[in-house]
A protein has these predicted regions:
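Domain-level signal for Mg2+-assisted phosphodiester chemistry and nucleotide/NA-binding surfaces
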Residues: 2-132
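Nuclease catalytic cores that cleave nucleic-acid phosphodiester bonds
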Residues: 103-239
Length: 240
């Protein structure tokens, strides 16, 4: 091809270009809608301490929560949220945050592997000192998922100092927020106008046997204090 022919061909090229395609309404409807998450964050150190407080000792493996039952509960919660948002893909995400004390890796490994085997992601952090807890990591993960799109949030913890304010702020944006724990230790969640509380023992199958929680039908001979379900200050607020 001569230089003249090449120039002529390049001038004619724009005329041969096809017009840009126009995306039809039918084409738009074929796109996957934005996904949302139902996120579960489990504060393992805090809930382990709470369970130990109820039992009066360190819980055994058989006394710990069954995460397969918790996973089924989360799937049911995700289906419930999805039913209220037709056309939106809602996916569950189950996470456990824990500390690994020096020398305990071999003891904790079977538990971590069991969690991963039933679909839970585990964030493990060395327990070096008192400042190496996982509170910041849980809040950072929640913030990350919120920026990506949260359909609902479930936090299993009794740590009101760390969680109450950020969870209530998320709830005020319209995201349903639930707190899971033991009612004896979660008065801050019970008293909140924006958070829903679920007692861990009310989730079917989570515990193999009923917990030895003190009630009127199981009082020790020397008597016992029955703690309030919520603080007295809750009388100053009205639940909507």
């Amino acid at each position: 091809m001569s230089l003249t022919e090449e120039a002529t061909a390049s001038e004619a090229a724009p005329e041969s270009l096809a017009a840009p395609a126009v995306l039809s309404a039918e084409g738009l409807s074929s796109f996957q809608p934005p996904a949302g998450r139902v996120l579960l964050v489990w504060d393992a150190p805090n809930l382990d301490m709470g369970l130990g407080s109820i039992l009066g000792r360190r819980p055994t493996a058989l006394e710990r929560p069954r995460f397969d039952a918790l996973g089924r509960w989360l799937l049911a919660r995700t289906a419930e949220v999805s039913s209220g948002r037709p056309g939106v893909v809602i996916e569950p995400e189950a996470t456990v945050f824990t500390n690994i004390a020096p020398g305990s890796a071999d003891v904790v490994r079977p538990w971590v592997d069991a969690l991963r085997n039933v679909g839970f992601a585990v964030f493990a952090k060395p327990k070096i000192d008192e400042d190496s807890d996982v509170d910041h990591d849980m809040l950072a993960h929640i913030a990350r998922r919120q920026s990506e799109g949260l359909a609902a949030l479930v936090v299993a913890s009794a740590d009101g100092q760390a969680f109450r304010q950020p969870l209530e702020e998320i709830a005020r944006t319209g995201v349903p927020v639930q707190v899971i724990g033991f009612r004896e230790h979660a008065s801050w969640a019970l008293a909140s106008d924006t958070l829903d509380f679920v007692d861990l023992e009310d989730i079917a199958g989570v515990f193999r046997e009923p917990l030895p929680r003190i009630g009127l039908d199981s009082l020790p001979d020397h008597g016992a204090w029955l703690q309030p379900f919520r603080p007295l200050s809750a009388l100053l607020t009205t639940r909507v």
